[in-house]
Amino acid sequence: MIHTAQFYINLEKEEKIFFEDKYDEDISIAITNINNVYGCKGITINYTTKNYGIFAIYFVIDFIKLLGKTDITVNDIDDINFEIYNFIVDVTGRYIEPIMIRIDYRLDVSVNLKEREILMYLYNKTLDKYGYKKKYNQYQTTIYYNCKSIQAKIYDKEEERKFKNENINDYEKDMLRFEVSLCNSHLNYNKRMYNMEKNIETYLHAELYKAYFKRHLEIFIQSGDYYTIYKARKKINNSNIKESDKEKLVEFLKCISKNGATKATKKYSDYYIKKYKRYLEELEINPILIPKNMKEAPTYIKNPFNLCA
């Protein structure tokens, strides 16, 4: 459900003295010393600030490392808070309530290499823009759908590790990762408008997690499994759709396959786009087809983006 989150704590004079006495007066050395202890446990201080005499520590938590497991749910909140409590008390001498300024939701799905390559190719044909969100796809194994306050992306986790020359953990092998990051401005908006506290417990709920993925990723990649035109046409022809609409639906799929989803929205009216998408949802066919001439491509790929799995 979650991967990482960033927090900060403000230190009073006594707490800063404790921090320096225990780890070092030189802040950079102190950070290195702390990270040497806590980095393997999933907690890393990335920087400190001093504004108007207030000293603040900013740190990132990798919840998979913190708890030693990948399936993290609201049932783990006590263990998460226990580890955060111990860390803060250790570096400041007492507990200070941390303020969350970013959280990264994740959905990891095991997909073989060939299908990961094909899926990343297909994701390039998704909409270029939806609302305030824009697609950025300059990288072969990563696609972003960003606005100022929320960043969504799809990437090949194993290939990302290789690119960074980092070790690949067992839970990262063959993984296609879907990720939605809520930035501080969005958390502040939720706090202001809905009185949602900026802490991990508030955001560690399955329904909220699903809502963010649907709103910020599913609108681009859509539901339904992936087919070649031959397989899709066969499924359409065997359906209960009106005969007059069957060939029109096939032509709609061909248009997206050839030109991408963005150009298809310019050719078809909103009425027909909604109509054809409704048909495709009923048939569980993704609007983006597997190219029939793609080398060694299968004729069917199950959609890995399944929030009910």
What would you call each of these model-derived segments?
Residues 273:
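Helix-turn-helix DNA-binding segment
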Residues 1-259, 283-309:
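Structured, helix-rich domain cores that form ligand/interaction pockets
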